[in-house]
């Protein structure tokens, strides 16, 4: 049975690809799930599906509602949530996803650079692990699934 990991958060770098590559290299039985990572589609889905909205608020609100269907379902089905916080943008959605995971009792791993430690101290305190690199996430998955530490290369 595959282990399902929801990759939440920052969409402007290749961290998801790095995790997927590491999982393939180690032949781990892991299914990766993500939110819509095409920013334009994520922002426009509400208006594109439900029609033009009268204000920017409702444009964003209808898109957020539709995206939440995917996000909530994916989080509820996941064995682990990995939330990446990047330095360039404030990822309020990522913090919200982390909170949903914790509230649902789903294991949480955060992934961010050291300079965000203070800003994310409460989120990190709720996480089972705080990673600095996608490779550390893959190492956690390898250990959790095998129950063994792999020798360092």
Predicted segments — roles?
Residues 1-153:
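Conserved catalytic or regulatory cores that recognize and/or transform ribose-phosphate-containing ligands
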